[in-house]
Amino acid sequence: MRHYQSFFNILVLGVAASCASFAQAQDVIGNIDANANADSQADAKADVTTWGLGLGVGVQRSPYRDYGNKTGVLPILLYNGKYFRVAGTTADFKLGSVSQFDFTLRAKYSNDGYKSGDATILNGMDERKDGFWLGGSAAWRAPFAKFTLEWLKAAGNSDGQTVKLGAERGFTVGRVKLTPHLGVTWMNNDYVNYYYGVKSTEVRSTRAAYTGKSTTNASVGLRTDYSLTAAQSMFLDLSVTHYGSGITDSPLVDRSTAPGLRLGYIYKF
């Protein structure tokens, strides 16, 4: 019970630190989580507890018509212990490892939601709330790359489900580590319909009714980590996301691809 109580306390602290100031910075945290988890997997079997604090800045182009960029600046909290791991808005309970495979239970916060008025095309739309997700993940630390599989189900609001398959490979040259990464994310029709659908009561002359359908997004990027000292590092992540037809067919959306940039500083204790 103490482990689960600690997990709850860490989760609350991580979400509060990451989301309190800038609710639209979830896209920034997305790759901060990936960056921190990559380091965490390397010492998954270690009993040493580590902490980290930092600051992240990110810019992500929104798929919504006339929305512009999502920009956020927010604090980063990292924690890695024997049973628990927190990276930004993601908290894991470690189930254990078998050979090169690691398994976790996962809780995650995402602010995919919007309010009427966030963009002209969203005027008159009902509010779409942010999401709290529960699920699990598995990682395969292969000799040539690291592969991850994540399944999440929304704890309310959208009733959505997502499945994400990711791959990355790091190359270290002196103090610089380059990590090309790619991912494919499937979203069920409930998720797409909640965030990109248009109900009959929301129809306008410039916005037709739309029922979302399941779709798949693909992303590719390059993350650069630079070690200032043994405890301090900076990272830069450049990526591009291609949205599936279930999203691009929505009258709320006017683009099929969106670039993103993340920059941050982390100090590990």
Where on the chain are the PLM-derived regions?
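Outer-membrane beta-barrel transmembrane domain signature
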Residues: 26-33, 37, 94, 155-164, ...
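Membrane-embedded beta-strand positions of outer-membrane beta-barrel proteins
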Residues: 53-55, 77, 88, 103-107, ...
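Transmembrane beta-strands of outer-membrane beta-barrel pores
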Residues: 57-63, 81-83, 107-113, 142-144, ...
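Hydrophobic, lipid-facing positions within transmembrane beta-strands of outer-membrane proteins
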Residues: 51-53, 71-75, 79-82, 132-136, ...
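Repeated loop/turn-to-beta-strand initiation elements of outer-membrane beta-barrel proteins
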Residues: 83-86, 101, 144-147, 175-178, ...
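Extracytoplasmic loops and strand-loop junctions of Gram-negative outer membrane beta-barrel proteins
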Residues: 57-59, 118-121, 148-150, 202-208, ...
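Cleavable N-terminal export/targeting peptides
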Residues: 1-48
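Solvent-exposed loop/turn segments connecting transmembrane beta-strands
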Residues: 62-69, 87, 95-97, 128-130, ...
